[in-house]
Amino acid sequence: MKTPTNLSDLFALSMTKFFRLIADTFFAKRYGHRAVVLETIAGVPGMVAGMLIHLRSLRSMKTGYGPQIREMLAEAENERMHLMFFIEIAKPNIFERLLVIGAQGVFMTFYSFMYIFFPKTSHRMIGYFEDEAVKSYTEYLELVKNGSVKNINAPRIAIDYYGLKSNAKLSDLIKSVRADEMHHSDVNHSYADNLDKKDQRSKNLKAVENINNNKVA
């Protein structure tokens, strides 16, 4: 996990720990059910970011935003597919389905506000979210390996999506999903780092400008 270097990073990490605590409280070691709810929420940030970056491109009438828009929308679609896999495995009950609706609505509102005003912090937070997801799937995989969770057949939809062998198991699916989350972590931390560098360059240019103005005065 990336070490926080400023207040923005600390806030992002604190929010991640807060949401992790809620997930641990509700689901404990029921990782299949945890995945259903969390993957519903995980599909939100990419869609929000992709939409807002798309709108920024339209407003500015400039190119260059395409790769990030596509990356964010691909992330959202990938997380949606994760949800489809674990619905087949966990068979969520009516309470969990209602929880999904409520959690998605709250998080959609929260993250949209965050991304409009604090895009760097938003990407950092999702990077930390994905780091926690990697931990959760690693713990899930360990339970499967030690026999605490039955290593059932992977759902057909997951086998087709990842191109797994026809006899693929839950452990194979978890490894594939975990690899996706690692990629999302790298992408979001990278975007946050780039925005951080851009902010620093702006501050440096402002400082130089102030020095030059003082010399003129």
Predicted feature locations:
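Non-heme di-metal
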Residues: M1-A217
